[in-house]
Amino acid sequence: MFKDNLISMRKMHGYSQAELAEKIGVSRQTLSKYETGESLPDIEKCRLLANALEVSMDDLVNYDKEANGNLGLEVPPKGKHVFGITKVGDKGQIVIPAKARKIFDIHPGDNLILLGDESQGIAVIKEDRLLDMLKRQE
């Protein structure tokens, strides 16, 4: 997973091996070894790679685009998430995945606001978070 994620993220950002290697302070040959799986970076180099590629370290190392719920998508940018697919129930209800509820601090009884854009789709945001954003704009 790591080597595949590293290659796809490097290419997505348009970096050559030499350019990315320079950003993290290693030789092009060392980066090439990371990409072939011949060697693995230490934790500090992983942190530098994740920062340069604008992804979380966890996603850089562990993200599996073929895993259930990732829909075959590449590693999402840092702070962005793929939570998988949820079905709409008979009465229009959806279940928000546990990981999404944890990340966004959503609990039973919270008020959520649904926003829609006919060309983009539907978004969900906690009521208090939207109100805070609106207050800051005043």
Residues covered by each model-derived region:
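Short basic helix-loop element that most often maps to the first helix and adjoining turn
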Residues: 4-23
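Conserved hydrophobic/aromatic packing and binding residues within compact polymer-binding modules
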Residues: 6, 20-21, 31-34, 60
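DNA major-groove recognition helix of helix-turn-helix
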Residues: 35, 45, 61-64
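DNA major-groove recognition helix of helix-turn-helix/homeodomain DNA-binding modules
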Residues: 44-59
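Short beta-strand-centered segments at strand-helix junctions
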Residues: 93-104
